[in-house]
């Protein structure tokens, strides 16, 4: 199905024919954003959705593959929310993890934090550098 069937505002700048299967297979051409993205933006689903709505694909959908965890995860999350009315975390928990008795989470509530391994940030000069992705490097 076309993404714009569930997300009408998405149907602009060459994205009218992007299918959900393109997103799921990382071949949508949306492996990042041209607009600047700050770390705190990733936690604002409405801002991320608006960035996707304005973004032009970096390649013709279905012709190449490109992966960027933060962009693809948020894109899938917005589609799931538009279809199911649930966040990606709630959808996964209710529809997959709980029925299959899987201890796997997308997002955690505070009660689960003691179970999480400590993560140490890599040394880098600018935290926003993680969002730098050049389309020419994806060829």
Predicted features and spans:
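Short, glycine/proline-biased beta-turn/loop segments that scaffold the active-site neighborhood
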Residues: 2-13, 99
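Short, surface-exposed loop or secondary-structure junction motifs
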Residues: 13-139
